[in-house]
A protein has these predicted regions:
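Histidine-acidic metal/acid-base catalytic patches
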Residues: 95-210
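Conserved beta-strand positions in the central sheet of alpha/beta enzyme cores
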Residues: 2-5, 41, 79, 141-144, ...
Length: 210
């Protein structure tokens, strides 16, 4: 297992709950280390009603930095994702908007926080995938290969059949020396057939681009 995905809610308006979220994540780090899992996908938190932009960013930055210190003790690597809305949450990701995601990215420099770039979520927000990827490229560690059939909302589809610009993405990261993990996020509900088609497509495109 290469990656464990977690759902820390560091933008919760209750400070006590934010502290609990950090404790939960610390336990996840410990579990991952015991299982030999290197990467831990982390998020900023939910877009709770009433939480101001500046407060949410401040809290997310504070707790992500603290989380990185804990992760280092366990020898695991936290990777921050441009997420949309996980089924486990009531609200969308606070940093689903591309400008918030990149601001949190910029404010967590030099603490060991790397990036897991999802190929569909920026499109689902309605922003420019390549523009955002270019900004976070210096700390790119892993990729979630996913696709969406619509812009402005997330509608998972068979990988390679939607709007995600895989050739452009792979070309850019290859040019910049990326040789990390590309994880398949198959959401077209086709079971193993969908996973096999996604793997074939990703391998084909990766092999074709320079």
């Amino acid at each position: 297992v290469t990656m464990m995905t977690t759902y820390p809610d560091f933008t919760h308006p209750d400070k006590q709950q934010r502290e609990r979220e950090l404790e939960y994540l610390a336990f996840d780090f410990a579990q991952a280390a015991q299982l030999g899992i290197k990467y831990i996908r982390v998020l900023a938190g939910q877009a709770h009603p009433g939480v101001k932009r500046e407060d949410g960013i401040m809290w997310a930055v504070e707790y992500l930095k603290r989380a990185c210190g804990i992760a280092a003790k366990y020898g695991v690597v936290p990777v921050y994702e441009d997420h949309a809305k996980p089924g486990a949450w009531d609200y969308i990701d606070f940093s689903h908007p591309a400008d918030i995601f990149t601001e949190i990215y910029e404010k967590t420099e030099d603490v060991g926080l790397r990036v897991n770039f999802d190929t569909a979520n920026i499109i689902a927000y309605g922003a420019d995938t390549m523009e955002v990827l270019q900004k976070v490229l210096p700390r790119l560690e892993t990729i979630h290969a996913a696709d969406t059939s619509t812009r402005g909302t997330l509608n998972h589809c068979e990988i390679g059949k939607g709007l995600a610009p895989f050739r452009e993405i792979f070309s850019l990261i290859k040019e910049n020396g990326f040789d990390g993990w590309i994880c398949i996020e198959e959401g077209s509900m086709q079971g193993m057939d969908g996973i096999e088609k996604a793997v074939r497509y990703v391998r084909k495109v990766w092999g074709e681009v320079k």
